[in-house]
């Protein structure tokens, strides 16, 4: 809330994002954006494109570019690198077994990084409704969310790392990806 704007974390999907009161900007990893939820109460690429064009125009008048703005944001808040991993399964019950196993016997490390904490999203967390999934925090500002897909026989894993640069984030994601897939398979 660096700019005195509230931040709200919700479950995946615009049915949850659109419920945020006075939403200024919402997005999900599946490339969906909302910038004018009063007009369009769902993801809306057209409004997002118009909004981005207005920002670019304003920056140009100041002699700046979108890249300049992004570099300023990354310098202030770090570069947030993200990746989604999908692990296909023969049947959904194997995901339930894995998640229940992690709940009963949490790991002390994943991909060589100490596990700082695990939030069981089946219990209400931070005002979120319960959902089947785990939010795992690793040393080094690394967040992993593991949940079953809502539409396919697969487990979805969302990784977020925060570093100083894009290259550092990509390197860290590369280091985590393989061991995480092996751990969860």
Regions found by a protein language model. Give the residues of each.
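Phosphate-binding and adjacent anionic-ligand microenvironments
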Residues: 1-148, 154-158, 165-173, 177-185
């Amino acid at each position: 809330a660096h700019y005195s704007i509230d931040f709200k974390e919700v479950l995946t999907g615009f049915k949850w994002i659109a419920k945020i009161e006075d939403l200024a900007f919402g997005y999900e990893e599946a490339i969906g954006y909302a910038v004018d939820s009063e007009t369009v109460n769902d993801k809306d690429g057209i409004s997002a494109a118009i909004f981005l064009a207005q920002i670019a125009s304003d920056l140009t008048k100041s002699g700046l570019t979108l890249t300049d703005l992004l570099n300023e944001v990354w310098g202030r808040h770090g570069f947030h690198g993200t990746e989604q991993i999908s692990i296909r399964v023969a049947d959904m019950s194997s995901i339930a077994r894995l998640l229940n196993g992690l709940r009963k016997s949490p790991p002390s490390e994943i991909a060589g990084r100490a596990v700082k904490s695990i939030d069981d999203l089946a219990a209400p967390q931070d005002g979120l409704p319960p959902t089947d999934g785990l939010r795992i925090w690793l040393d080094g500002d690394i967040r992993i969310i593991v949940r079953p897909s809502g539409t396919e026989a697969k487990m979805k894993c969302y990784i977020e790392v925060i570093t100083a640069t894009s290259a550092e984030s990509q390197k860290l994601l590369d280091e985590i990806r393989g061991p995480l897939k092996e751990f969860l398979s």
